[in-house]
């Protein structure tokens, strides 16, 4: 599954990014209540997509950081599935990244790489492309690219 979670920010200031819009006194008045509501709505979508079984692989875009991902997999009912996280802070000025969640017992990671976006061979201040190669529980090899343009 792939899901653009549309500005999944915590409500803490990150001095290295332009996240002021998502602070309690920012333009969106991003309170802890709004953060928790967003967190719960995202977990509900992931569960609904999986039906009776959780999705083995979940690509996400527009996540602020590893903290929100850890909250998603540890502080919601998704915790019982023990999702693992692949994420790296990107050079994006707003601080939004791509990530992959996966079930370790269903998907074995062979390779991961974050591919920078370049213009004229110069890395741009934007989200990297996340490349993940792995083997499913049915022995199929997948090459996954998670990106957001």
Residue ranges and their predicted role:
Residues 1-82, 86-96:
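N-terminal, active-site-proximal structural segment of metallo-dependent hydrolase catalytic domains
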Residues 1-7, 27, 111-113, 141-149:
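Active-site-proximal beta-strand elements of phosphoester/diester hydrolases
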Residues 63-141, 149:
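Structured beta-strand-rich core segments of catalytic domains in phosphoester-bond hydrolases
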């Amino acid at each position: 599954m792939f899901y653009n979670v549309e500005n999944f920010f915590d409500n803490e200031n990150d001095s290295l990014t332009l996240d002021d819009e998502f602070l309690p006194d920012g333009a969106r008045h991003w309170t802890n209540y709004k953060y928790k509501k967003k967190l719960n709505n995202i977990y509900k979508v992931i569960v609904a997509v999986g039906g009776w079984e959780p999705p083995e692989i979940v690509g996400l875009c527009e996540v602020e950081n590893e903290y929100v991902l850890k909250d998603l997999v540890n502080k919601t009912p998704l915790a019982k599935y023990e999702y693992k996280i692949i994420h790296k802070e990107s050079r994006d000025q707003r601080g939004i990244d791509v990530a992959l969640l996966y079930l370790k017992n269903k998907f074995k990671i062979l390779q991961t790489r974050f591919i920078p976006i370049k213009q004229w061979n110069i890395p741009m201040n934007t989200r990297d492309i996340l490349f993940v190669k792995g083997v499913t529980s049915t022995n199929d090899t997948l090459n996954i690219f998670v990106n957001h343009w």
